[in-house]
């Protein structure tokens, strides 16, 4: 018999080989559960293990919005792209950051201003844009949409909502810096760096005057080249270009910024198509067909953007512009999905619709101003008729120049300074200039106005736009009307006076139609003693004879009027006047006979068909006057006596 302690120790030890084998099998099962279950699943399936597992990838977390940052920008490049006179021209000038002096060009009463390092702040901006925004991908879509007449329809997967580092439009210094980037600047370099061709070599024989035509882009970059700003400036702006205006820019701008091709407006507008079918009724299909020729300012802006982004492929791009350059900046921002800040820009919602730019799902293609997340901010003031969309009246500067600026809506948000209410300004085109905006608006106000979204704005509200299948034809016919009149006037003046001729002989020949009654009238007046205000003695005899002959045909009548003045007045008129009117007989066999009146007493003159007193008729003294002065006083009588005052 074993001791008790020995028995307790042996109780915890396994002396059977079968038990050892079972423990090893259980250990292997614990280490490899899944393979063994799969191997023996045909005998005892386990419902919890064979359930399907969701293998879809986990969606990536949304990136954190960029943090606000400070940027210091300097001018790096100047790009110049021709538009109408030199459409193939594309040149670039590099600006050395250390040796160059950048100056703001003088404008009227504003002198030159040196531009140094420009500071700006960035803040998160939400933009709904295409996922693939490369110009090589977007440009063919825009060209196809313009040819088809409607925007391209893309799937929702092609769009993305991004938080990008855009300009802080609540910061005053940032707004002023961006306005200086959009202004007209020039560079003075010690080495006199010249322009270099970016695209095809430009014809050097046409190298004179090219800088006055086209769209110019000033490229600013920060210290790390992580953010660049493209400032667009039209050197030959199609709205206020003066002597450089051509027909082409009026055609393009009136297609984009007018309701119906500059029709039914002031006579000064340059009409560019015939799409109006009635009073404020326009065939929009006709307008789209007229738009197939690409706007050269928009084309120049896209090519300039492509070259700049190729030079800075990983940089964050901001676009700024003024006036027409501001409108082009906004269109580029809608095309490529970049933040935009404009100053006094022409309302561009109407051309954005007609260009057929890509739109996200759920947006109205006929109202681009209803898109909320565009990243565009339009800064302006209430005294600028171009910005507020009122530069289209009969006396407006735009209308006088032939431009129909009827668009009134901006895409994105509007930041409006109320200069009319706050400063008492009057609406005028002089407040549109960028130097006026910088000096008298941006720097004068302490705060930047709130930028508001205005989706309720509507362009061309009084027009009825309709689509058609393109089979309508418009026929306009007119009947030419010709009116001719032949008139002969023969005049011989023998005694000129202060106001006209004192003696006048006139002969008039014309066509007339006879009636059944004719009444010739002869009036003869002879003055022997003229006075200061008329004739002191005046005798007038009027004799009328009427002959009635029924004539039913049309005849030709010749009227002859003869006037002879023997005693001209001292200051004007004639003291004796004899007028004779003869009405010729019609061209028929019937002849009219004038019967002479019977003889009258000597106190009354004898009437006759033609009465012309002899030259040098004597006055009451019985003397004849042989010559008179220019004011009517007789200076020479017969008999050799001197001048006599006959008053």
Swiss-Prot record:
Catalysis performed (reactions): a triacylglycerol + H2O = a diacylglycerol + a fatty acid + H(+)
Highest taxon of source: Eukaryota
Subcellular location: Endosome, Multivesicular body membrane; Prevacuolar compartment membrane
CDD domains per record: Lipase_3 (cd00519)
Function of the protein: Lipase which is essential for lysis of subvacuolar cytoplasm to vacuole targeted bodies and intravacuolar autophagic bodies. Involved in the lysis of intravacuolar multivesicular body (MVB) vesicles. The intravacuolar membrane disintegration by atg15 is critical to life span extension.
Family indicated by similarity: Belongs to the AB hydrolase superfamily. Lipase family.
Protein name: Putative lipase atg15
Organism: Neurospora crassa (strain ATCC 24698 / 74-OR23-1A / CBS 708.71 / DSM 1257 / FGSC 987)
Lineage summary: Eukaryota, Fungi, Dikarya, Ascomycota, Pezizomycotina
